[in-house]
């Protein structure tokens, strides 16, 4: 596989555009093929078997297009399908997981040997929070920290329907999920869905100034770079990269919304 081959990036819909955008920013020589499966969104309320089948269909599409790696820019699809995809394909398959370690590590102070327990909300889809992969991740950190799981399916729908700019709707939806918590005593919110990255400014409005809003996009793209470099597959310096957008929903509304989110 040539180092100038593209990278395939997919999501259940439009959320993974936030990851494609991060790749374009951090790895500008890379050519990204983005595929959003908006016709089948949301994945977060489907069964793991349904998500696996959809994920395999998309990766097959990428393989036919000659990609050198695939990024599953979807926490839900990662939870349900990443292990099976890695067993089946001989190209790197990079997954996403909620950046819980980053949130909990904020309690480690270099000058103090004692961990400061963190109070963390993980906002994600229902399926991500139900899957064994997340339970295993949570088991690593919940003995020293207080971790709240908050499924937020409506946040996916708001992005997919193009209503992200409706401030009143978004804040009303966020308050519906998070007013049950004493936000003054929350240390961080982990955005465990790539759709939720587009809500970063709204979460900042919701949270006290000292609290962090954390997502896994930068770490995922950094890992992608390390993997490609180790294989000698980074695009040549000076190559003209970019992002090509495709979607299972062929409507102009989705195409226009995709372009808008890529350039937010």
Swiss-Prot record:
Binding residues annotated for substrate, in chain numbering: 11-12, 43-44, 75-76, 194-195
Active site per UniProt: 74, 193
Stored Pfam families: Asp_Glu_race
Class in the EC hierarchy, top level: isomerase
Protein name: Glutamate racemase
Catalytic activity field: L-glutamate = D-glutamate
Family annotation (PROSITE patterns): ASP_GLU_RACEMASE_1 (PS00923)
Enzyme Commission number(s): 5.1.1.3
Pathway(s) per entry: Cell wall biogenesis; peptidoglycan biosynthesis
Organism of origin: Bifidobacterium longum subsp. infantis (strain ATCC 15697 / DSM 20088 / JCM 1222 / NCTC 11817 / S12)
Record's signal peptide: none
A single MF term (Gene Ontology): glutamate racemase activity
A single GO BP: regulation of cell shape
Organism ancestry: Bacteria, Bacillati, Actinomycetota, Actinomycetes, Bifidobacteriales
Lineage: superkingdom: Bacteria
Keywords: Cell shape, Cell wall biogenesis/degradation, Isomerase, Peptidoglycan synthesis
Family classification: Belongs to the aspartate/glutamate racemases family.
NCBIfam families linked: glut_race
Protein function: Provides the (R)-glutamate required for cell wall biosynthesis.
